[in-house]
């Protein structure tokens, strides 16, 4: 009955809040612990080379912390309907190529080769440039963590959308649940020992894409994981 449905909805909301608090605590604790540890080491060593190394790690941890808080802030604004999209017409393929090329060094370090499939379609879409950048960065971070050596980027026309698909073989032993990749705080490592992932990147990305009038989906087929983003063509 109606009261039972309301009770179930309330329980689900409480569970989501609990998971959010647990996830947020875990994800903020990891970089803060690293910062605290290396600050203590800095106080104990005088070797210039070691101090430079520790400072670099501290800076990286601070950057991760800032990135996480930005994502949590965006997520809170989206879920409370306080965030409005600033939509513009732009070249989907040009934006994607520029963002991917900006990660060239990281792809090289991980030995991941990215191939862009040739296309002859007009990829002009309606999107918020800053939010699209956030979505693409999250997709790339996912690639860097789980891709096994290669990734392929393709575009296709599916009226009224232009579809971007990023497909990659996944590393052996990776536990990926396609049904859960867009859930808040889900990480492919179910034990949450993956200290590089906040677990909200793809969840936030899906919300952002939907806010731009598009769709975002994931698929796992024969060891190939693919993420698709559809934005309205102009």
Question: Which residues make up each language-model segment?
Answer:
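Conserved micro-motifs of the catalytic ATP-binding
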Residues: 80-85, 124-127
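Conserved catalytic submotifs in the C-terminal HATPase_c
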Residues: 88-89, 113-123
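Short helix-loop "hinge" at the ATP-lid/N-box region of the Bergerat-fold HATPase_c
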Residues: 142-144
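Short beta-strand/loop element within the Bergerat-fold HATPase_c
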Residues: 150-161
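Short conserved segment of the HATPase_c
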Residues: 173-186
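Short alpha-helical Gxxx[C/S/T] motif in the catalytic ATP-binding
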Residues: 201, 205
């Amino acid at each position: 009955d109606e009261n039972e449905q309301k009770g179930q909805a309330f329980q689900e909301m409480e569970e989501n809040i609990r998971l959010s608090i647990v996830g947020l605590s875990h994800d903020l604790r990891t970089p803060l612990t690293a910062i605290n540890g290396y600050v203590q080491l800095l106080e104990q060593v005088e070797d210039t080379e070691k101090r430079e190394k520790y400072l670099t790690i501290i800076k990286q941890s601070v950057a991760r912390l800032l990135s996480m808080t930005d994502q949590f802030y965006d997520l809170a604004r989206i879920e409370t309907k306080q965030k409005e999209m600033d939509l513009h017409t732009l070249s989907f393929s040009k934006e994607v190529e520029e963002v991917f090329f900006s990660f060239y060094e990281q792809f090289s370090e991980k030995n991941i080769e990215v191939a862009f499939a040739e296309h002859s379609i007009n990829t002009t879409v309606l999107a918020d440039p800053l939010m699209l950048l956030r979505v693409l960065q999250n997709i790339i971070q996912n690639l860097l963590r789980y891709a096994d050596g290669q990734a392929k980027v393709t575009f296709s026309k599916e009226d009224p959308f232009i579809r971007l698909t990023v497909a990659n073989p996944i590393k052996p032993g990776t536990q990926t649940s396609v049904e859960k990749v867009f859930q808040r705080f889900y990480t492919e490592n179910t034990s949450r020992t993956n200290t590089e992932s906040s677990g909200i990147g793809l969840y936030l990305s899906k919300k952002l894409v939907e806010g731009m009038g598009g769709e975002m989906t994931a698929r796992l087929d024969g060891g190939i994981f693919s993420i698709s983003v559809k934005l309205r063509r102009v």
